Amino acid sequence: MTNYAIILAAGKGTRMTSDLPKVLHKVSGLTMLEHVFRSVKAINPEKAVTVIGHKSEMVRAVLADQSAFVHQTEQLGTGHAVMMAETQLEGLEGHTLVIAGDTPLITGESLKSLIDFHVNHKNVATILTATAQDPFGYGRIVRNKDGEVIKIVEQKDANEYEQQLKEINTGTYVFDNKRLFEALKCITTNNAQGEYYLTDVVAIFRANKEKVGAYILRDFNESLGVNDRVALATAETVMRQRITQKHMVNGVTFQNPETVYIESDVEIAPDVLIEGNVTLKGRTHIGSGTVLTNGTYIVDSEIGDNCVVTNSMIESSVLAAGVTVGPYAHLRPGTTLDREVHIGNFVEVKGSHIGEKTKAGHLTYIGNAQVGSSVNVGAGTITVNYDGQNKYETVIGDHAFIGSNSTLIAPLEVGDNALTAAGSTISKTVPADSIVIGGSRQVTKEGYAKRLAHHPSGSK
């Protein structure tokens, strides 16, 4: 059995009120088109053809070499869009799935079941349908007294009886590939919209006494086509629920799943605890036994086993096992923390590697630095890495002790076991095992404060 796929992605999406093509709006971190394409891959298509139109280069870039593309210059209806794919699929033996690129909730399992139903029933066409409590706006499935599908009628063309029908067309179909393109040559624009309806091929097949069937979705949510921001929000809600439920089944604990945002490509190991208002985005991996507390935001990062991240932001960083971060810390892109590192409150790290068991507990900036293991970085320490034009590196050796309020002016190297005194400004190499005092010498003038305005006896 050879399968093909046609994805309809040419529309502008006027009701989205956006410069972005409709299918490129995101749901849980992926464009709607990407969600659809991932589901389509479940049927293992020999060839996938994406019909593009509005801002076609932007749409093409999302799938790149994963699909063939055809261009629909004018949007003259779904039938016309499928006609555009004829140059890619004409004459091929097999079954062709036709699906809209704005249906992000459709699952691969449902598409595979649709194909299997189509093949097992030897249909020339099979419609994916659903039962709607409120079918207004959808095309209706019209059956005869024997339950056979005889036609699909659009909302604007439906009579009073047809408008009462609850079974609706989801806009997804499977066809015998050759018969599809033969039937498309016979459809017209004689309808309320003045468009080429793909659904008109059903009546053509029926007139030729060819078998048309319908496979009914179990989950109505999968039929959602996103045409505006309201539907986009609905899709986001459903997808978020799916994602959190998947992780819970796999052993992740959520204290308040309704407030958590987790994107589609995030991986979470068992025995992770996630509190409320946590955001996990991009290609993030969370290791087993890790705890993410309220307000944590992580994107494109790898978090090792048994870490604790407390109300902090982590971007494009790698944390080994046993690391603790926060509260209110910020790990910026290019940060790597080895085992059991502690990054405390109001500490910012960027583009740096920090060795195991090193601690930076408070109010510190570490940028463009290589920090060894078992280093203590005192409160208020700053690596001065930028001169207005270039960034420079700071290297701190193993077991060094950086005193509070040290200012380390890069390029700079502090050797193993070295110590900087509190309040020092360091601009030259500190040899291993050395103590450096870089602050100004204290001068005390007894009684002088009485002459200053702040003193009770001072001048006013």
Swiss-Prot record:
Catalytic activity: alpha-D-glucosamine 1-phosphate + acetyl-CoA = N-acetyl-alpha-D-glucosamine 1-phosphate + CoA + H(+); N-acetyl-alpha-D-glucosamine 1-phosphate + UTP + H(+) = UDP-N-acetyl-alpha-D-glucosamine + diphosphate
Database matches in Gene3D superfamilies: Hexapeptide repeat proteins, Spore Coat Polysaccharide Biosynthesis Protein SpsA, Chain A
Region feature (Pyrophosphorylase): 1-229
Positions of region (Linker): 230-250
Disulfide bonds: none
Keyword set includes Metal-binding: yes
Cited InterPro entries: Bifunctional_GlmU, GlmU-like, GlmU_C_LbH, Hexapep, NTP_transferase_dom, Nucleotide-diphossugar_trans, Trimer_LpxA-like_sf
Binding site residues for Mg(2+): D102, N227
Any one GO molecular-function label of the UniProt entry: glucosamine-1-phosphate N-acetyltransferase activity
Catalytic residues (UniProt): H362
UniProt enzyme class: transferase
Cofactor(s) listed in the protein's UniProt record: Mg(2+)
Job description of the protein: Catalyzes the last two sequential reactions in the de novo biosynthetic pathway for UDP-N-acetylglucosamine (UDP-GlcNAc). The C-terminal domain catalyzes the transfer of acetyl group from acetyl coenzyme A to glucosamine-1-phosphate (GlcN-1-P) to produce N-acetylglucosamine-1-phosphate (GlcNAc-1-P), which is converted into UDP-GlcNAc by the transfer of uridine 5-monophosphate (from uridine 5-triphosphate), a reaction catalyzed by the N-terminal domain.
Protein name (database record): Bifunctional protein GlmU
Lineage: Bacteria, Bacillati, Bacillota, Bacilli, Lactobacillales
